[in-house]
Amino acid sequence: MSESLEKPVVKIALGIEYDGSKYYGWQRQQEVRSVQEKLEKALSQVANEPINVFCAGRTDAGVHATGQVVHFETTAIRKDAAWTLGVNANLPGDIAVRWVKDVPAEFHARFSATARRYRYVIYNHRLRPAVLSQGVTHYHLPLDAERMHRAAQCLIGENDFTSFRAVQCQSRTPWRNLMHINVERFGAYIVVDIKANAFVHHMVRNIVGSLMEIGCGNQPESWMAELLAAKDRTLAAATAKAEGLYLVSVDYPAQFELPKPPMGPLFLAD
């Protein structure tokens, strides 16, 4: 077939949300459920051709997202409704497309991103929850959110996060630029809101695990700064559970004009 008859390739970005509790993480793997596999299957049905997607951040097993961003290339010409309503009709109920946007060839969901933002939701009550039990992390001891917030501020800026990095992390460097970290109580819920240019493996959950030790009084506020300086993962607290973690937003240069829907999760304001 001559080049003039070849179908043009278009690049499309999607905003995705999912409840990760029934998935073995984002990344497609053999013989286990993954969000990527379900999304690619649904997109391929709508496009009537194989679709491969690239995401902004690969979430672990049990982790959720309200603001995941993906891109893919296709020769299929479809209306926006096909990439939203049509794809959603082919997805399981715990995965959904939130928006669609045509993007230029130079856009990449991962490499064009300038920052990622996560929220970690703790249900701080003596008794465990039933409703939303897979969407929050239960912690039974009383936590002082203001104390946790003060302790966390030492993490802001460019730092070596070795003390909060999983042993199996494959990143070339432990250095990350943490832009903000806020800890706030909403009734029985505590939300840790954290934004950085990127994250080392388990960074958010390891930070939260140590903050909870401070919040319940087991460690002083100064402990976070000591851990950061020590650059030793074995000194920090255990990794917090996956259930309470949400990827809520990914930042991109303004030139791409990507939608910015409410981050959530649920009723949490931006």
From Swiss-Prot:
Q: Which reaction does it catalyse?
A: uridine(38/39/40) in tRNA = pseudouridine(38/39/40) in tRNA
Q: Out of the domains of life, which is the source? A: Bacteria
Which InterPro entries is this protein grouped with? PsdUridine_synth_cat_dom_sf, PsdUridine_synth_TruA, PsdUridine_synth_TruA_a/b_dom, PsdUridine_synth_TruA_C, TruA/RsuA/RluB/E/F_N
Q: Mind listing the GO biological process terms from this record?
A: tRNA pseudouridine synthesis
UniProtKB keywords: Isomerase, tRNA processing
Write down the PANTHER family for this protein, in alphabetical order: PSEUDOURIDYLATE SYNTHASE, TRNA PSEUDOURIDINE SYNTHASE-LIKE 1
Q: What is this protein identified as?
A: tRNA pseudouridine synthase A
Which organism was this protein described from?
Answer: Cronobacter sakazakii (strain ATCC BAA-894) (Enterobacter sakazakii)
